[in-house]
């Protein structure tokens, strides 16, 4: 009986036993792309001084690029105090988003919104003056001047109502005009962060907490919206309104009223700033606990089957409850400290209002002030309560939003390790002959400095040949595929494709030339059709159906209620492992890449389906004289390869054809083959029996 390998027909060399009897002896290996493991190590963030304050002198440099570290140590001030470097960079970055270069229409919209805001504040300050005049005009003899007084008062009432309505109208128009500005800024930052995350290396994503990342982005974008509105439409306008009120009080009523007002502003601001700085630590604790809770929940749901396999629902619920308890405790501290802040602010303002009312009543009693003046002073000071209370709210919410934005901008500050060199050029494959020669020259690489995976590995994969890479677990097989695909850069040595150093070609052109079937096939929560189309986005439905037939997915399509439009579930959990691998192979064939990599591409298939699919793959690959590399533990599937490279301890121990390697009975390949061919099965079973007996 003829067996089929990945690259062609293979005749049996000796008596073979069913794979089911020897599968337990096949040496296992790590997958090319593992399911993401949640790291318990929180990303190290730049320290934020909890006592840094906000309220403004030196402002922003328009040359600052979004999310880019700068070496300048220029200080930024807000609310009269120096804020931290990280907060300064965030504020500068936000200014760029609302005042972008080469977008005059965008700038005009910002200017128009600011104009509406100023008009709203001017009308708002006029309202108490109309009220004062109405009161004073009422204090006359109506019998002598009924018509005149009625006309004047009627006009003042209309003006009063018009000013109040106009202030509200201009304020709402301002919000409408600025809405697109804020949303555009949010979209830009979120998009840039997402693109930056996609450009990060594989190691970054394998070591990060997915739930924490998504929550940080969500809170960060909301924080951007608040900061933009607070900075542009509240801090400056509130300062403008307070200045106008103080000026009016000094001009009309002397320094005493203005002194009380200024003392109130100062006391209010100092109390708010100090208390908010104290509360910042509680908010940061709440954010960290919130991130941890989101991470635990997401990790538990992504690993739903593992939770069920080991009956650990209670354990996961306990972990989630612990994270929620930490968040609850931190949130209680946030709420109680907020109550203290609000009570203190109200006490300061109420004391000031009481003092000014006493001074005003005393003026009326002595005849130096009219009743209208008393009303005006009361209205002006009381009117300040809204922006003043909002000023405190703005400060504490601004600090909170900056904390929420902190992780978002820290993500953008992570260095992209795998990127194009300054002089990178597109990969040019051999156009005159067969493309895809791959050469490793003294390559050394390890995921950790103290544990190298490859050590001075050198070998050549000829163009157009079918190469298999085998070896014990941890010998570096999957690492080679990752390095070819440039998920990582080598520590030393070089990798060439058609004579070009892959570190000096563009990453996009390199990966466009390579197709891969990973052992763990990640799929999108989309239809079968769209998951296959992901291999080549411009592929037609007809081409996709051809690939479905070639990889024998027709039965799955026929049995599915929605056919090719069946949703495969998150990461493909709603279809079997074998179906996922066939779908991945269909996606690879659709890509038409000149270099193809197979990492245990048929490990989840039964023997019959595997043999049938291998024949199909061989036919497709034979038509294209390209380079094909396969990693396998089932040595029968790669025995027909043009060359087999045997790795051991990070180095090439031997290489050759299947026949040549078997001629040396002491070769590592022969040992692996003999184990799988059951020649040593009795010895293995005896050792297993002894170990079992010892354990008893």
UniProtKB/Swiss-Prot annotation:
It is an enzyme of class 7 (translocase). GO terms for molecular function: ABC-type transporter activity; ATP binding; ATP hydrolysis activity. Residues 132-154, 252, 359-373 are mitochondrial intermembrane. Gene3D superfamilies: ABC transporter type 1, transmembrane domain (1.20.1560.10), P-loop containing nucleotide triphosphate hydrolases (3.40.50.300). It is a multi-pass membrane protein. Residues 438-674 form the ABC transporter domain. GO terms for biological process: intracellular iron ion homeostasis. The chain crosses the membrane at residues 110-131, 155-178, 228-251, 253-273, 340-358, 374-395. It comes from Debaryomyces hansenii (strain ATCC 36239 / CBS 767 / BCRC 21394 / JCM 1990 / NBRC 0083 / IGC 2968) (Yeast). Residues 68-109, 179-227, 274-339, 396-696 are mitochondrial matrix. Homodimer. Performs an essential function in the generation of cytoplasmic iron-sulfur proteins by mediating the ATP-dependent export of Fe/S cluster precursors synthesized by NFS1 and other mitochondrial proteins. Hydrolyzes ATP. Binds glutathione and may function by transporting a glutathione-conjugated iron-sulfur compound. One of its GO terms (cellular component) is mitochondrial inner membrane. Keywords: ATP-binding, Membrane, Mitochondrion, Mitochondrion inner membrane, Nucleotide-binding, Transit peptide, Translocase, Transmembrane, Transmembrane helix, Transport. Residues 1-67 form a transit peptide. Pfam families: ABC_membrane (PF00664), ABC_tran (PF00005). Belongs to the ABC transporter superfamily. ABCB family. Heavy Metal importer (TC 3.A.1.210) subfamily. The lineage of its organism: Eukaryota, Fungi, Dikarya, Ascomycota, Saccharomycotina. It is found in: Mitochondrion inner membrane. Glutathione binds at residues 279-283, 342-345, 392. The keyword Magnesium does not apply. ATP binds at residues 447, 471-482. Residues 110-400 form the ABC transmembrane type-1 domain. Its EC number is 7.-.-.-. This is Iron-sulfur clusters transporter ATM1, mitochondrial. SMART domains: AAA.
């Amino acid at each position: 009986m003829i067996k089929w390998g990945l690259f062609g027909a293979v005749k049996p060399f000796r008596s073979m036993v069913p794979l089911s009897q020897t599968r337990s002896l096949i040496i296992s290996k790590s997958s090319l792309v593992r399911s993401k493991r949640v790291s318990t190590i929180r990303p190290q963030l730049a320290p934020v001084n909890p006592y840094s304050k906000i309220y403004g002198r030196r402002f922003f440099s328009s040359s600052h690029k979004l999310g880019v570290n700068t070496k300048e140590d220029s200080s930024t001030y807000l609310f009269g105090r120096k804020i931290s470097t990280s907060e300064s960079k965030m504020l500068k970055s936000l200014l760029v988003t609302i005042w972008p270069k080469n977008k005059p229409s965008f700038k005009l919209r910002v200017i128009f919104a600011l104009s509406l805001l100023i008009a709203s504040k001017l009308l708002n300050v006029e309202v108490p003056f109309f009220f004062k005049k109405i009161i004073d005009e009422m204090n006359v003899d109506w019998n002598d001047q009924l018509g005149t007084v009625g006309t004047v008062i009627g006009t003042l009432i209309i003006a009063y109502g018009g000013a109040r309505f106009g202030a509200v109208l201009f304020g709402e128009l301002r919000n409408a005009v600025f809405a697109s500005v804020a949303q555009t800024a949010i979209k830009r930052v979120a998009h840039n962060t997402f693109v930056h995350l996609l450009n990060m290396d594989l190691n970054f994503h394998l070591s990060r907490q997915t739930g924490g990342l998504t929550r940080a982005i969500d809170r960060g974008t909301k924080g951007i919206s608040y900061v933009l509105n607070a900075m542009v439409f509240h801090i400056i306008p509130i300062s403008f309104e307070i200045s106008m009120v103080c000026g009016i009080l000094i001009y009309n009523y002397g320094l005493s009223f203005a002194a009380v007002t200024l003392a109130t502003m100062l006391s209010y601001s100092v109390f708010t700033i100090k208390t908010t700085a104290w509360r910042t630590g509680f908010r940061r604790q709440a954010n960290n606990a919130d991130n941890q809770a989101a991470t635990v929940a997401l990790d538990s749901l992504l690993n739903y089957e593992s939770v069920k396999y080991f009956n650990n629902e209670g354990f996961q619920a306990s972990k989630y409850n612990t994270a929620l308890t930490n968040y609850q405790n931190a949130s209680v501290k946030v709420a109680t400290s907020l109550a203290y802040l609000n009570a203190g602010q109200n006490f300061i303002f109420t004391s000031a209002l009481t003092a000014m009312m006493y001074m005003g009543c005393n003026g009326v009693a002595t005849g130096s002030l009219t009743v209208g003046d008393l009303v005006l002073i009361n209205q002006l000071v009381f009117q300040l309560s809204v922006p003043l209370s909002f000023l405190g709210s703005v400060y504490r919410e601004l600090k909170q939003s900056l904390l929420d934005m902190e992780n978002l901008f820290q993500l953008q500050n992570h260095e992209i390790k795998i990127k194009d060199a300054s002089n990178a050029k597109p990969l040019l494959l051999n156009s005159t002959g067969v493309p895809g020669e791959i050469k490793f020259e003294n390559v050394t690489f390890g995921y950790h400095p103290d544990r190298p995976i490859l050590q001075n590995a050198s070998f050549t994969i000829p163009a157009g040949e079918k190469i298999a890479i085998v070896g014990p677990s941890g010998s570096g097989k999957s690492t080679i595929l990752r390095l070819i695909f440039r998920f990582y850069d080598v520590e030393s040595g070089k990798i060439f494709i058609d004579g070009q150093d892959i570190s000096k070609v563009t990453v996009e052109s390199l990966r466009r030339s390579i197709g891969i079937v990973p052992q763990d096939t990640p799929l999108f929560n989309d239809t079968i059709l769209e998951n296959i189309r992901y291999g080549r986005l411009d592929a037609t439905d007809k081409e996709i159906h051809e690939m479905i037939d070639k990889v024998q997915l027709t039965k799955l399509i026929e049995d599915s209620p929605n056919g090719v439009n069946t949703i495969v579930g998150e990461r493909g959990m709603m279809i079997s492992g074998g179906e996922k691998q066939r779908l991945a192979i269909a996606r690879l064939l659709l890509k038409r890449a000149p270099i193809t990599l197979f990492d245990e591409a048929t490990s989840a298939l039964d023997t019959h389906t595997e043999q049938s699919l291998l024949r199909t793959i061989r036919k497709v690959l034979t038509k294209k004289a390209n380079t094909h590399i396969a990693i396998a533990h089932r040595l029968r599937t790669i025995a027909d390869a043009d060359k087999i490279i045997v790795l051991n301890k990070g180095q090439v121990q031997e290489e050759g054809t299947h026949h040549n390697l078997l001629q040396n009975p002491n070769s590592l390949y022969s040992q692996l083959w003999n184990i799988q061919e059951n020649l040593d099965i009795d010895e293995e079973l005896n050792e297993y029996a002894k170990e079992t007996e010892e354990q008893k």
